């Protein structure tokens, strides 16, 4: 078995682990609430976040969807907790670039999120992977706009 095949297998295992055992599943009370959906495949997510100044104090999600969208939400909420908003948004940009097959800044450790790299080869699934990240961006914009 080649190195790439082993890596693909590992990445699939990481994705399935986050799908079957999602981190941060649930709802936060008194928080920023963002509902997003992907009409193409039916994925739905509700992201709830609490900020302490410019720090993402906590983030949880609930929803229904394919393994990629739910695993991505699990990975994202895990990755952004404790990060400042600027870093969280930078991670979102990096993830978006990765999904589009663009060169991306690898100076920020994405952790398990890198397991989703292979999704970029399947254009129909990119929206699944980026749904929770779009919710993050919308939530930050909502908070900064005071809505």
UniProtKB/Swiss-Prot annotation:
It holds the Pfam family NifU_N. Gene3D superfamilies: 3.90.1010.10. Its cofactor is Zn(2+). One of its GO terms (cellular component) is cytoplasm. Bind 1 Zn(2+) per monomer. The keyword Disulfide bond does not apply. GO terms for biological process: intracellular iron ion homeostasis; iron-sulfur cluster assembly. Its EC number is 2.-.-.-. It comes from the Bacteria. Belongs to the NifU family. Part of the SUF-like system that mediates the biosynthesis of iron-sulfur (Fe-S) clusters. Acts as a sulfurtransferase and thus transfers sulfur from SufS to SufB. Mechanistically, the transfer from SufS to SufU is triggered by zinc-ligand swapping that provides a free thiol from SufU to accept sulfur from SufS. This is Zinc-dependent sulfurtransferase SufU.
